[in-house]
């Protein structure tokens, strides 16, 4: 909300920040009143709000998470998922798809395994259709995963009672582990999901959709294992 942005800006200034940067991604890009929202944010926090494009968001996440060399990046957000391929600082390709965890959950809530399997297949078709350019690259990069779905998966895999994204930095997840969590979560009730160590209660409804997106992406891009990163577009923006 506008008030939340104002509070964050005020807190940053109270902590001594000399310059405040504010940028908006998928939710504001898609909102009918996105421009009105950013204008109100600018008025309350006293700094310009930049609405970044989907491709720009993909590049920012890559810059934030890449550690150099040939790198593929998957950033699963609420409204969209970004894919980027690069070598060091050179971007080979970047794309943003309209299939975030919140968006996919709104289209088809995952209440049983059949819902999960259908979501995986839907996401695979979307990737085949909208990320053809990236799928055509023959490079074999190290893959890195960014966003709440990734770090939540890491926290659940390690059974960390109090979720902290930084504790998952550098952790790796393979495809069987991702697919296994997808199957287990899909078969759980909402109450059971809320009891899983590492899964914050407010993510209990959307996390299976995020995992379905990740499984679909790993299968389409031929990813057997990826490294988790707590860094993403905010880090990339500051760089």
Residue ranges of predicted features:
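Conserved catalytic-loop position in the HRD/HxD motif
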Residues: 75
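Helical "lid/coupling" subdomains associated with nucleotide-phosphate turnover
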Residues: 1-19, 25-70, 85-239
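Acidic, divalent-metal-coordinating active-site segment for phosphoryl/phosphodiester hydrolysis
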Residues: 79-85
């Amino acid at each position: 909300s506008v008030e939340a942005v104002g509070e964050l800006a005020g807190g940053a200034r109270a902590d001594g920040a000399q310059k405040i940067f504010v940028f908006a991604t998928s939710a504001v890009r898609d909102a009918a009143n996105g421009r009105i929202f950013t204008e109100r944010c600018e008025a309350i926090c006293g700094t310009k709000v930049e609405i970044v494009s989907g491709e720009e968001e993909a590049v920012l996440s890559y810059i934030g998470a890449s550690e150099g060399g040939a790198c593929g990046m998957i950033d699963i957000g609420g409204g969209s998922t970004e894919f980027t391929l690069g070598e060091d600082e050179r971007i080979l390709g970047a794309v943003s798809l309209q299939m975030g965890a919140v968006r996919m959950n709104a289209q088809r809530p995952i209440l049983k395994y059949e819902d999960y399997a259908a979501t995986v297949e839907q996401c695979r078709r979307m990737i085949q259709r909208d990320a053809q350019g990236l799928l055509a690259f023959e490079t074999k990069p190290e893959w890195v995963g960014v966003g709440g779905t990734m770090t939540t998966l890491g926290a659940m895999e390690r059974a960390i009672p109090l979720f902290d994204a930084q504790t998952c930095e550098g952790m790796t997840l393979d495809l069987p582990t991702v697919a296994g969590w997808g199957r287990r979560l899909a078969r759980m009730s909402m109450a059971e999901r809320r009891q899983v160590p590492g899964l914050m209660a407010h993510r209990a409804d959307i996390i299976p959709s995020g995992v379905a997106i990740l499984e679909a992406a790993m299968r389409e891009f031929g990813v057997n294992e990826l490294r988790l990163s707590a860094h993403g577009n905010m880090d990339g923006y500051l760089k």
